[in-house]
Amino acid sequence: QFEDELVKIWNKPKFVKNSNYVITLDRINNLELIEKILNHININEQIKEWQELGIVDDTFKVKEVFENDIYGKKLTKKYEHLPIDTKYFKDLELEILSQFEDLDNALDGWLIKSENYQALNTILPKFKEKVQTIYIDPPFNLDSSDQFLYRTNYKDANWATLLENRLRIAREWLNEKGSIFVRCDYNGNWIVRCLLDEIFGKENFRNELIVRRFKKNVMEKEIKKLPEGLDTIYLYSTSEKFSYINPYKLKSEKREGFWRHMGDSSGQGSPKIFFGKELAPPKGKHWKYSQEKINQMIDEGKLILECRNCGYIHDKSKGLWQGCPECGIDDLIPKYWVEEKIEEVLDSNWSDIYGYSTTWDFPTENSETLLKRVIESTSNKNDLIMDFFLGSGTTTAVAHKLGRKWIGVEMGEHFYSVV
């Protein structure tokens, strides 16, 4: 009974301690209000933060934010995107927020500093079934936490419980076309697969992706094993309706364009008209394209007839087929032009890109290239992206750059210094 009471307390939605807004100057359509902000008693604290973040240098002057033209005073292009943090201007916060008729819709994203289970549970009513894509890279199930800013030395059962509790709530955040990516390594991929099968359903498993990781020099430690070079990312959807756009990658070698025989598709088909000549496909085969498509390809110069006997080529410039002018034999094969190819549809092997990055010297910082592929393959502009093991903030940063809305949850102090 005591344990049940503890569970009830743990699951009770928590109160928000405080909330602040970061709004760029160009979004505030009130010059008088901007002047109030820039003349505020706390503006020096805001400037100090800008300097620490590298947004302005030590020579910055408030008066440089405005300029005058024939229409009067306006924001300069150089400083119109300076971000105002309302934590420094609490007495002006309501006036700033009143500039937006629909504040929720105006916001690009939400950053939440909290233990993630409590955040997911508390804010669920606001975002239930509204998220399109979730990406998480939870703490790996390792023996030690020495190299990380967060705990990784969980027992298998504890680690499984930690993930299960959060994944169950996270599923409720996803809409019917939504999907989730969960990154893990060889220590825990078997646990993650079982959990995702149970929570999302085996029928909603989509892919087991592999991504590159940093290799450790195991030879120096005299460990008799191959260095781990890959991590796993499991992709699950909420239903058959899930949104997916095939990503492409550059081919290692460019494939030149070429003429290809049109009659190599299995299954007997009917004759088609080529340059006024009716041709039946080979026995047991059918012409690859419809008559409408064949006519279009002829008009575009992308279809020819080749004489099997002498190799004579008949194309659009020669009009209707009147027989082979070279050998007189009427034995033809239609061919169509296959364009050169520098890209190919990506498969589940994502080792062509780096899975980690060192931009911020943050342990296990996921690369922007990886997150770009994740987000573009499962969402569209203005869709909502979430990461509740945010770490260095790559997911929300890339979502923002790609024109998506975003939610990030992180509890560490790097929430302020890195995210």
Indicate residue ranges for each PLM-predicted region.
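Class I S-adenosyl-L-methionine
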Residues: 4-384, 415-416
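Glycine-rich SAM-binding Motif I of class I
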Residues: 143, 393, 397
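Hydrophobic/aromatic ligand-binding patch that stacks against planar heteroaromatic rings
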Residues: 172, 397-398
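Class I SAM-dependent methyltransferase "Motif I" SAM/SAH-binding loop
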Residues: 389-391
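Short beta-strand element of Class I
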Residues: 405-407
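Conserved acidic E/D residue at the C-terminus of a beta-strand in Rossmann-like folds
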Residues: 409-411
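Conserved SAM-binding loop
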Residues: 419
